[in-house]
Amino acid sequence: GAMNDLFLNTAVIISGHEKVVTRAYEEESQMLPNDLALLDVDQLIINLDKKYPDYFWSPRITFGGLLDIPDKNGETRDQGPVFAIGIDLLGDDSRMSEIWELDKNIVKGRLPQNFDEALISQRLANKLNVSIGDTATYIGTTMYNAFTTYNFPIVGTFDLHKGQADNQMMLVDISGARKALDMENAASEIF
């Protein structure tokens, strides 16, 4: 029982049950190399649905960087590293909230309702002294290795009860991740 839950929960965060990535991305996956991401993802998912109709396929973008929390004057109040995951939270047919059990894991606030809204782990919120309604600025690189900053309003905090796995985690809708990282119709992986 407990071991099955552990393996299932880890599979949800790390990969899903089956995963499609580029060979180059797989070789460098610990570096979160979105410059090696899948392209034309919409068509890839259509093809996967036809070939493997018993599976549920969904794109995901994993990315890391720095999360900057400004004060009332727009100056840095606090900042820290972030591991972020863009999943389909807003799609009509999406099951990501169900698969991730977000409804029962929300500590404060609500689920994102707009593409640019974010959930952060309760631990990260405590570390950065973030409140619901604050804006967090993601600082990182696009899939073309260009410098980027993107503002995500914080609408909720979560605790996935995964120990260190969700210690520095932020969850956003994949459309927000795509906009922040210049990854239109691209994804780190399909799972």
Per-range role (PLM):
Residues 1-20:
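Alpha-helical transmembrane segments
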Residues 23, 27, 33-185:
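A structural signal for hydrophobic secondary-structure junctions
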Residues 188-190:
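Extracytoplasmic/periplasmic membrane-proximal domains and adjacent transmembrane bundles
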